[in-house]
Each structure stands twice: as structure tokens, then as C-alpha cells.
A protein has these predicted regions:
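Non-catalytic terminal accessory segments
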Residues: 1-2, 298-460
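Active-site environment of divalent metal-dependent phosphoester hydrolases
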Residues: 16-19, 68-71, 97-105, 169-172, ...
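N-terminal active-site segment of His-dependent metallophosphoesterases
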Residues: 1-75
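Active-site neighborhood of phospho(di)ester-bond hydrolases with catalytic His/Asp-centered motifs
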Residues: 9-11, 59-65, 90-97, 199-203, ...
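Extended active-site neighborhood of metal-dependent phosphoesterases/phosphodiesterases
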Residues: 77-182, 256, 277, 286
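Conserved beta-sheet core of the metallophosphoesterase superfamily
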Residues: 216-294
Length: 460
């Protein structure tokens, strides 16, 4: 009996060279504003690659954003890591917009200063640079207007990988230009004619996972329903993507009844450092299991990955909540890529709220809501159970659940679920005509329960 084909997917390694700076005020602001790590990426990638090298997987597939911001030095260092892994495993990857710094804002940090004087890798040099991990083995390839490539490789007699570069669709969004899409159509038809299962991999999402409030807009390809319908109706059943840094599985069924299932892979260098192991079954279904990196070596010491990464993730919220100074608040908001100066104009009103949320318990929050006449509908029994729990503990748990694909699931009858949902429902009651407020309820439900699929272990 033939051995099942085994694939390992990872995404968003965002390797950052330490030569670009790892200390100082500006670095701290940048590092503290992101769910994923920065200076620690090299050590995390090394540990993950060692784990994968010792596994029984046949192929390692990387879904884009391999570098932090396209810095040449980061690419050079990352390729050396690939070369070491390649001694034991076959690797295929795609690049994405961070790999050629599409926003033209590469940075290096030195104390209180940040500089853009950083050499980056232009898009047209990416695929020659990563040639042995991309188009060398391609049975078909397509060069985009950026000089990047989509390509097809034969993974086994009956399985092919459709590796798609979706950086630009020519209309200001991620996706594919018309001729590019025609090439994709041809490859899907050829795979069907040859009796092969085609597994897709691209960087941007086809489906707004969890809810469009979280992964809509620029997180997805442009004209996403048109794109996913065309792919599914032409025979593509599975797509693996990155970009959102969220671990989540969802599907879409076209008006013609064709279903495409998409697995969104979280960032390898952020909580919970997911490694998605996939087995291709005899009936051409896919079974996946998500592993999380347990340990990595940092500054010569073995570090427990999960608490370290979870703290780094939740700190981006705590860094804002702990602001008691207008200038610090503006700097933190700016680091989150928002207009800190404009928001800080209202700091006089925001500061008391930050202070309250940062220190208050569920019981104190309930009293405050009751005083404001907003406690109607809050589950009192659930409040009592979590009366002395800090609000920030709830925020942390929700954030981590959104990112890790609900490793911990909450029953809809549990006190935790009832309390969160009754609080989340308050804005929709105040703004009854606001669609986004109603979406917030469905978003919270998906985060707490995990949604339609088991995001950690499932056959699709």
C-alpha cells in the first residue's frame, strides 16, 4: 500500500535581521505594536525548522511573507535557514507583499531614531533568489507584471500544488490580472484532465475568516466572491493561505454548488507558532493537525514558546491600556499604524476609560454599566462567577482565541460564553441600525466556539 502524502504548511515567517536593530525607544514601539515577534524571529524559525526536519513530512510549503519588510539582509539570512532545512525536506514557497516592501517603508532602529536607509529586495529579483524553492521544479509557471511567479509542481502521481502569487490584481488590490487568471483556469483544467488533485496555496485570503470585521477589506483578494467562485467552479477544492496571522478554517459554496475549503495559517513567529501538518487521504480528502512550537532557544536559554508568544501578543493591548500620558498614548497609537496625533486630541476623555479597563474587575464593570443604565441583559449569574476576574484577563483570552483558532472552546451554555456575549450585545442594542454592531455578535460567537470547523484537527 502506498504511503500517504504528507505536507507541512507554515506562513508569515517574517524573518527580521538583528542587524537592523533590537533595542531603543523606536524599536520598542515597533516590536510592542505587533502580534508577531521581531528580534526573536530567527530563533523561532530555527526551532520550528528543526522540528519539521525531524518529522515524517514529505514537503514543506510556505505561504508568503518570508521576510519582515523585504530587507535584503533578512532575505539572505532566511535563505540560509531554508538551505539547512532543505538538506532533509523538499521546500516550496511563494513570496508576498512584505517580501518586496510594497509600502516602501523598510526600517532599521538605533536608539531613539528610525531610518529607512535599508536595502530591499525588488519583486523581480525574488524568484531568481529563491529559484530552487519555487520555479525550478515547476511543470508550469506564469510571470506576473511584478516579475514574481505563480507555478505548479507535481507533489505525487496524483497531487499537484498550485502556488499562486496574488500580490496585485491591477486594480489596487490583491488578486490576479485577467491573463494571470486565464493561466490559472488552464492549470485547473489540465489537473482535472490528468486526474490530479490540485491543492492551492496563496498569501491573501479568499474568505473573510471569523468575520469581515476582522479579516475583510485588504486582508482578502479583491472581488473575492468572484475569484473564489471562479476557482471553485473550475475544480479547486482546497486553498491554504496566510496573511491574517489567524488560524482558522472556513468554506465557500458557489451558486453552482461547488465548495472550496480554505485553511488560514497563523504566523509562525507569533502566538501560537502554528505548524499545519496535512495528510492527503486515499479519497483525496485532506486531514490536518495543527502543532504549536513548544520551545526555542533565546539568548542561550531554552524558552517555553507558548507563554512567551502569548505575552508578546497580549502586550500590544496592555501597552495601550497602561498609557497615562498623552504623548505616550499618541506614540503607541501611531505604532499601530493609526493617526496617533488625531486620536490623542481626545485623550482627556479616553484616559479614564483606559485606567478603568486596565485595573477593573468584572464586578466593578458590572456596577459601572448598571450606574449608566447599560446593565440590562447582562447575565448576572455569569457576573457572579467571574466577579473578581480582571477585565484584561477577558480581553487577553478573547484575543488569543481569535488568533489561535479557539484552542480552548467555550460551550454556549457556559458562564464565560454567556457573560462575553451579553456584554458584546450592548452596542447593538444602543445602535440597532448599525450592521457592524450586529456582526460583532457573530464575530464573538465564532471566536468563542471556533466556528464551523475544528481549527486544530479536521478532515476536509
Amino acid at each position: 500500500m502506498q504511503k500517504p502524502l504528507k505536507l507541512t504548511f507554515i506562513a508569515d515567517t517574517h524573518h527580521y535581521s538583528k542587524t537592523l536593530g533590537t533595542s531603543g525607544r523606536q524599536y520598542e514601539l515597533r516590536s510592542g505594536s505587533d502580534q508577531k515577534c521581531l528580534a526573536e524571529t530567527g530563533e523561532i524559525i530555527d526551532a520550528a525548522f528543526e522540528k519539521i526536519a525531524n518529522s515524517d513530512t514529505d514537503f514543506v510549503l510556505i505561504a508568503g511573507d518570508v521576510s519582515n519588510d523585504g530587507e535584503l539582509v533578512s532575505h539572505i539570512e532566511f535563505k540560509k535557514k531554508l538551505d539547512r532545512l532543505a538538506k532533509k525536506k523538499k521546500i516550496y514557497l511563494i513570496t508576498a507583499t512584505h517580501d518586496w516592501c510594497c509600502d516602501e517603508n523598510p526600517r532599521k532602529f538605533d536608539g531613539d531614531t528610525v531610518s529607512n536607509d535599508v536595502e530591499t529586495m525588488p519583486s523581480f529579483k525574488l524568484y531568481p533568489f529563491y529559484e530552487e524553492y519555487t520555479i525550478n521544479d515547476a511543470i508550469a509557471k506564469y510571470e506576473t507584471h511584478l516579475g514574481t511567479y505563480s507555478y505548479v509542481v507535481q507533489l505525487s502521481d496524483k497531487v499537484r500544488l498550485l502556488a499562486l502569487n496574488d500580490d496585485q490584481n491591477g486594480k489596487g488590490r490583491a488578486g490576479f490580472k485577467p491573463k494571470h487568471f486565464e493561466w490559472i483556469d488552464e492549470q485547473l483544467k489540465k489537473a482535472k484532465d490528468d486526474g490530479c488533485l490540485m491543492i492551492g496555496m496563496e498569501h491573501h485570503l479568499l474568505i473573510p475568516h471569523i468575520n469581515p470585521l476582522i479579516t475583510g477589506g485588504g486582508t482578502c483578494v479583491g472581488d473575492r466572491e468572484e475569484v473564489i467562485t471562479r476557482l471553485a467552479d473550475n475544480g479547486l477544492r482546497y486553498m491554504f493561505v496566510g496573511h491574517s496571522h489567524i488560524q482558522h478554517t472556513d468554506d465557500y459554496t458557489t451558486p453552482s454548488g461547488n465548495k472550496l475549503t480554505e485553511v488560514n495559517i497563523g504566523s509562525l513567529v507569533g502566538y501560537p507558532a502554528p505548524i499545519v501538518n496535512v495528510t492527503v487521504n486515499d479519497d483525496m480528502t485532506l486531514s490536518y493537525t495543527v502543532e504549536h512550537l513548544e520551545k526555542f532557544t533565546l539568548n542561550g536559554r531554552e524558552t517555553d514558546a507558548q507563554p512567551f508568544l502569548a505575552k508578546h501578543c497580549t502586550d500590544l493591548v496592555h501597552n495601550v491600556l497602561s498609557c497615562r500620558d498623552k504623548e505616550e498614548f499618541a506614540a503607541r497609537i501611531t505604532a499601530l499604524q493609526a493617526n496617533g496625533g488625531a486620536v490623542a486630541k481626545f485623550f482627556f476623555a479616553i484616559k479614564p476609560l483606559l485606567k478603568f479597563v486596565d485595573g477593573a474587575t468584572v464586578g466593578e464593570m458590572y456596577k459601572k454599566l448598571k450606574h449608566l443604565g447599560l446593565a440590562r441583559g447582562i447575565d448576572k449569574e455569569a457576573v457572579h462567577e467571574f466577579y473578581n476576574t480582571k477585565i484584561t484577563d477577558f480581553i487577553d483570552r478573547l484575543l488569543l482565541s481569535a488568533i489561535d483558532g479557539s484552542v480552548v472552546k467555550y460551550d454556549r451554555n457556559s458562564a464565560y460564553y454567556r457573560l462575553v456575549m451579553s456584554i458584546v450585545s450592548i452596542p447593538s442594542k444602543l445602535l440597532k441600525s448599525n450592521t457592524d454592531m450586529k456582526r460583532l455578535i457573530f464575530t464573538a460567537d465564532t471566536i468563542l466556539t471556533g466556528g464551523k470547523y475544528n481549527n486544530q484537527n479536521e478532515t476536509i
